[in-house]
Amino acid sequence: MPKPDPLVICRNCAYPYSDLGRHDKHQRDSDNVTPIILIPARMGSTRLPDKVLADIAGLPMIVHVLERARAAGLGPVAVACGEAVIARAVEAAGGVAVLTDPGHPSGSDRIFDALNLLDPGGVHDVIINLQGDLPSISPEYLHAVLRPLADPAYDIATLVAPVTSEEEAKAHSVVKCACAFGEGQEVAPALYFSRNRVPSGAGALWHHIGIYAYRRAALARFVALAPSPLELREKLEQLRALEAGMRIGVARVPAAPFGVDTQADLELARRNLGHYS
């Protein structure tokens, strides 16, 4: 296998080609699935109201996310909108927008609503749920989130990245995943998620990235479940799936993407994306 430029990122595992040992067993993640990417978006963010329409380098944030999802080339991309003003912004950028019930309690409920409106015939068997506040997300990470679904034992897939500092490990805002990767493994089962430091003891810690790939039946089952005790305690929706016996597989990627949750985050995104626009 010839050695490409080390700055090029592999479409399948989201690691640089310079680490050749990771790539010799790859097959395209999407060969056996027909994904659709859905981006839930609403105006009512608590910490940064209306952030999905915040201007970044001349475009609403949701449009940056839309363009990066399209760049992945995995399949159709649509925004599941809670309000018409978001739909208008998406359509003005040439995107597909679906108006959903503004009262949905979660992004998972919103994308399931949009899925049934867009694809009532069930053509798409995998649904990628991409957050609308990740304006610099690498399209390669959307390929990476499909990797666990190569194993039929997993119902849901998501991503983790290494925790790289003590500050990150202690941060309540950083969700940690209890998982362990064997030598050479890129996928592992998720055993628990917490805002606290898990697991205890020496060893790697993993920062959960809230991008999910659901098998269609798993998404339907998940949204039909009532909120679970640990979900309510930790305020982490994915624990509902684990408590119900569903299996979540995690793929590891090099670093957590930058998310916009505060005004300071927004200003940083404007500086970074403005520089490259």
Segments (PLM) and residue ranges:
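Short, high-confidence coil segments that cap the C-terminus of an alpha-helix
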Residues: 74, 122-124, 152-155, 246
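Conserved core of the sugar-phosphate nucleotidyltransferase
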Residues: 137-228
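Conserved alpha/beta core of the MobA/IspD/sugar-nucleotide pyrophosphorylase nucleotidyltransferase superfamily
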Residues: 203-277
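Short, positively charged and aromatic/hydrophobic N-terminal segments
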Residues: 15-19, 25, 29
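N-terminal glycine-rich phosphate-binding loop and ensuing alpha1 helix
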Residues: 32-81
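Short phosphate-binding loop-to-helix
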Residues: 78, 85-144
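Cysteine-centered motifs
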Residues: 10-13
